[in-house]
């Protein structure tokens, strides 16, 4: 028996058993288990929180993607509407320009026709005056007296009425 008591392993085993007994007497195992349980609960809570945050992030991502898609659709609609509006305004401006040009052309043609008519009238008037003057000169040189005066007046009236 002295051989076993002289071995250090024996005394280590005895010290271990005594230490375990003291730990059991003071309830150290309960404290260790309680600490481990608390750690387990804390880790589980952190994992649950991480899962909840992950789901929340996924929901926010889906919402962001939906909003982005909606914004892109709305932007496309606005662009299409702006293009349609620009085309409508361009067509309207073209129609107004064509109408303006047509009215200006008609006005210019009317002024040209009026100027032509005035020029023709002026030429006729000048021709009539020249013919009257020529007839007066010829008649006054060829015919003398009261007869010449009557013929001259009648001739002038006739020429004026025909030329004007």
UniProtKB/Swiss-Prot annotation:
- Membrane-related topology note: Single-pass membrane protein
Listed transmembrane segments? 8-28
Its GO CC terms are:
plasma membrane; proton-transporting ATP synthase complex
- Short name of one Pfam family for this protein? ATP-synt_B
* A GO MF term: proton-transporting ATPase activity, rotational mechanism
Membership in a protein family = Belongs to the ATPase B chain family.
Q: How does it assemble?
A: F-type ATPases have 2 components, F(1) - the catalytic core - and F(0) - the membrane proton channel. F(1) has five subunits: alpha(3), beta(3), gamma(1), delta(1), epsilon(1). F(0) has three main subunits: a(1), b(2) and c(10-14). The alpha and beta chains form an alternating ring which encloses part of the gamma chain. F(1) is attached to F(0) by a central stalk formed by the gamma and epsilon chains, while a peripheral stalk is formed by the delta and b chains.
Annotated protein name in UniProt: ATP synthase subunit b 1
Q: Which organism is it from?
A: Rhodopseudomonas palustris (strain BisB18)
- Source organism phylogeny: Bacteria, Pseudomonadati, Pseudomonadota, Alphaproteobacteria, Hyphomicrobiales
